[in-house]
Design a protein with these regions (language model features):
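Short alpha-helical transmembrane segments in multi-pass integral membrane proteins
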Residues: 1-18, 76-141, 187-241, 297-364, ...
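Residue-level signal for short hydrophobic patches within transmembrane helices
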Residues: 7, 11-30, 34, 57, ...
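Transmembrane helical elements of multi-pass membrane transporters/channels
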Residues: 16-35, 137, 148, 171, ...
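Generic alpha-helical transmembrane segments of integral inner-membrane proteins
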Residues: 22, 26, 30, 34, ...
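Helix-terminus/linker motif at the lipid-water interface of multi-pass membrane proteins
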Residues: 26, 30-48, 118-125, 181-188, ...
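Small-residue hotspots at the loop-to-helix junctions and early N-terminal turns
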Residues: 45-56, 135, 194, 266-281, ...
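Small-residue-rich hydrophobic transmembrane alpha-helices
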Residues: 48-108, 145-164, 271-335, 368-382, ...
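Short runs within selected transmembrane alpha-helices of multi-pass transporters and secretion channels
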Residues: 69, 138-156, 164-172, 193-206, ...
Length: 445
């Protein structure tokens, strides 16, 4: 069912639209989290480190595809908000052709260049074989990543954030069952969790496409309507490539930090891998408030309702602040209990490093909440360059400070942790300055 976000209470619309996205993101995170828990508890520390490092690489590669879909969805939402369904169909076919070509290129390049990727990441020798095998299987499933995300992005652009959730729930449940079967039953180890993820993602992608085609007339595209529109492609390429650059810069920065952590050994890798999973869950609600806000802004821009965009900014700031205060307290106080989900209590060093990371980062979640709001605002307005600038400031600060501080003998790992909130704070300051400038010309949005 489509939803018009240009009428009604902004705060109610954003919450109701974001909740299914939060649940969907929760279950999407479950793919690797379940893999991490299973290998951490039943295979061992080295397997946990392998899957954690592989996950960082996987997220970087898939973020390019996801970014392309998210960028194209901004144009789809604007056309839907304007009621221009003929152009919307043209935009869909043009986007689909463009993104699937990029996906196949990414799949081939990733498989061919996997050795270079692993060397760049400083993967220790004892983890090399498992990490390589995990990634090879995951890279073969990039076509499913494309398929699911382009359909899910379309449905969200039309105001339907529930349907993608249902298929992610199904897929996550299947992933858990297959993890248990392949790892505990067949004793396949790291290979087992990779195969489970591949199968589960494939089923979710295919079923989501079939359901959407059956229930959404906009997907019933005839041969005559199947057009690659050059003029639309220029707009789509601008939105998609800029959003993809933002996503890939974000994850490339994390990739560089992961490489730095890897240089501290397997214990640090395992701790960082588990702590980052917890962190991902912690700020997931505010991330999806930002994603929901992007669709809200795009539809209202298409409908030329600038005042509602300003109302939406105030709503998202309040929502993000409320959630971040609660989540920060939970993570800070429960850091040890959260780490024990991923690693055995006998791994004292791993536990202590992970707890330290979480207690440094947790008090500052409100900063990342505001940053996601700015990302959503500028993406929805179609000013993706501003989002890229904020991402470069945030991640650039984090990476540079991490490499500088980590090399100081009496600081070490904790310097990597403190670089994170400093990067968030600087990006928020610049983001607010951009917003102040845009507010002055709001009526021209």
């Amino acid at each position: 069912m489509t939803r018009d976000l240009t009428v009604g209470s902004p705060i109610k619309l954003i919450i109701s639209f974001a909740l299914p996205m939060i649940m969907g993101n929760l279950f999407q995170q479950m793919y690797n989290v379940v893999d991490t828990i299973v290998v951490g508890q039943f295979v061992g520390k080295n397997a946990l480190a392998s899957v954690s490092s592989a996950y960082t690489i996987m997220v970087f590669i898939t973020s390019i595809i996801i970014g392309l879909c998210m960028g194209a969805a901004i144009l789809w939402a604007q056309l839907f908000g304007a009621g221009d369904y003929k152009q919307l169909k043209r935009a869909l076919t043009t986007s689909g052709i463009f993104i699937i070509i990029v996906t196949f290129c990414m799949m081939l390049l990733s498989l061919v260049g996997i050795e270079y990727i692993l060397r760049f990441m400083n993967i220790p020798y004892e983890l090399y074989a498992d990490t390589k095998m995990y990634l090879q299987i995951i890279f073969c499933g990039l076509i499913f990543t494309f398929l699911y995300n382009i359909v899910a992005s379309l449905l969200r652009a039309l105001g339907d954030s529930k349907t993608p959730l249902y298929f992610l729930v199904l897929s996550a449940m299947l992933n858990i069952i297959l993890d248990i079967l392949f790892v505990l039953g067949l004793e396949w180890g790291v290979k087992g969790v990779a195969v489970a993820t591949f199968i589960a993602q494939g089923i979710a992608a295919i079923l989501c496409l079939l359901y959407a085609y059956k229930h959404y007339e906009i997907l019933h595209i005839t041969k005559k309507e199947f057009i690659f529109d050059i003029s639309l492609f220029k707009v789509i390429a601008k939105y998609s490539i800029l959003t993809s650059i933002q996503q890939s810069i974000m994850n490339f920065g994390i990739l560089l930090v992961q490489g730095l952590v890897n240089s501290f050994g397997t214990v640090a890798m395992a701790a960082f891998g588990a702590a980052v999973k917890i962190e991902g869950f912690a700020y997931m609600p505010v991330q999806d408030f930002g994603n929901a806000f992007a669709t809200y802004v795009a539809q209202n821009k298409g409908a030329q309702k600038a005042s509602r965009i300003q109302e939406g900014v105030k709503c998202v700031v309040k929502l993000s602040s409320f959630f971040c205060v609660i989540i920060s307290a939970v993570v800070f106080i429960g850091a040890k209990e959260l780490m024990l989900i991923f690693i055995s209590s006998s791994e004292y060093e791993v536990l202590n490093i992970g707890i330290e990371y979480l207690r440094v980062i947790a008090p500052f979640y409100v900063l990342i909440g505001f940053l996601f709001m700015f990302y959503g605002l500028y993406r929805g307005l179609g000013t993706m360059k501003l989002s890229i600038i904020l991402t470069i400031i945030s991640l650039g600060t984090r990476v540079i400070l991490a490499y500088v501080l980590a090399r100081i003998e009496y600081i070490g790992l904790i310097g990597i942790w403190w670089a994170v909130p400093i990067g968030w704070a600087l990006a928020d300051g610049v983001g607010y300055k951009f917003y102040s400038q845009i507010k002055k010309r709001t009526l021209n949005l």
